[in-house]
Structures are given as C-alpha cells and as structure tokens.
C-alpha cells in the first residue's frame, strides 16, 4: 500500500453515517471501526480519505442490510490539503465496499473519487468514472 502524499484531516469518526458509492445494493453505511487506528483511551477512532474502515449496512436491499463489511473512504466533506497548496472537499461523505483482497465488490462507482484514493487503490481507480 502506498503512502498518501496529501495532508489528510480525518473528517469521519466511529458512528458516522456515510453513503455507499457503488452498486452493491447498500445505500447507507455506519462506521464501526477504523483499520490500523492507534489512538488514546476513550478517544473515538477517526477515518479520512483512503482509510480502510469496517462498516455496517443500515439502508439498502434486504440481502445487504445488517451485514458487517470492509470499505474504503473515497469522499469526505472535511477539506484536505494537497502538496501544491490546494484544498479539496466533496459534497458528501462516501465509501466503496471492498473484499478481502482490497478490490471493489461492485462493478460501478457513482460520483467522483479523490486522486489520493486512486493512487493507493488501483482497482478502485479503474472502476471509477471520475477522479478529482
């Protein structure tokens, strides 16, 4: 896995509701944990762009609801700072559901994804229609 060059402020914490940006049948996801987060006692785990998270499906098809899955954050409302000084933020918080190998489970990604996620996850970038 490649390091992200931008200064990413974690804009999502445990318990946040985010939209699902793929066509797996899930519409809304709830963050239950953040992979690799090493925080302090009583501090809520936080996630940002490109982080792998564990989510629970709260809205979607009956087959997808109440499943616990892994996902990657592809959009966040909190601005991030790129090395050239520009700041990028999106209209919503969104994630893409992935399998054990880190490849997207869906065949289509709705909406744009960030360039930082595209550099880290090549298979998600090849599925995406727009990279910002």
Swiss-Prot record:
GO terms for biological process: translation. The keyword rRNA-binding applies. GO terms for cellular component: cytosolic large ribosomal subunit. One of its GO terms (molecular function) is structural constituent of ribosome. It comes from the Archaea. CDD domains: Ribosomal_uL14. Signal peptide: none annotated. It holds the Pfam family Ribosomal_L14. Keywords: Ribonucleoprotein, Ribosomal protein, RNA-binding, rRNA-binding. InterPro entries: Ribosomal_uL14 (IPR000218), Ribosomal_uL14_arc (IPR019971), Ribosomal_uL14_CS (IPR019972), Ribosomal_uL14_sf (IPR036853). Part of the 50S ribosomal subunit. Forms a cluster with proteins L3 and L24e, part of which may contact the 16S rRNA in 2 intersubunit bridges. Binds to 23S rRNA. Forms part of two intersubunit bridges in the 70S ribosome. Belongs to the universal ribosomal protein uL14 family. PANTHER family: 50S/60S RIBOSOMAL PROTEIN L14/L23, LARGE RIBOSOMAL SUBUNIT PROTEIN UL14. NCBIfam families: PRK08571.1, uL14_arch. This is Large ribosomal subunit protein uL14. The gene is rpl14.
């Amino acid at each position: 896995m490649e390091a992200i060059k931008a200064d990413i402020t974690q804009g999502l914490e445990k318990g946040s509701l985010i939209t699902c940006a793929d066509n797996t049948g899930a519409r809304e996801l709830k963050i239950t944990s953040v992979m690799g987060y090493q925080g302090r006692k009583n501090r809520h785990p936080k996630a940002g762009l490109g982080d792998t998270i564990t989510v629970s499906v709260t809205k979607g098809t009956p087959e997808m609801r109440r499943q616990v899955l892994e996902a990657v954050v592809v959009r966040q409302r909190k601005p991030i700072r790129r090395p050239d000084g520009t700041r990028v933020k999106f209209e919503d918080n969104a994630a893409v559901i992935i399998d054990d190998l880190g490849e997207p489970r869906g065949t289509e990604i709705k909406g744009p994804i960030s360039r930082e996620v595209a550099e880290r996850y090549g298979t998600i970038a090849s599925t995406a229609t727009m990279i910002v």
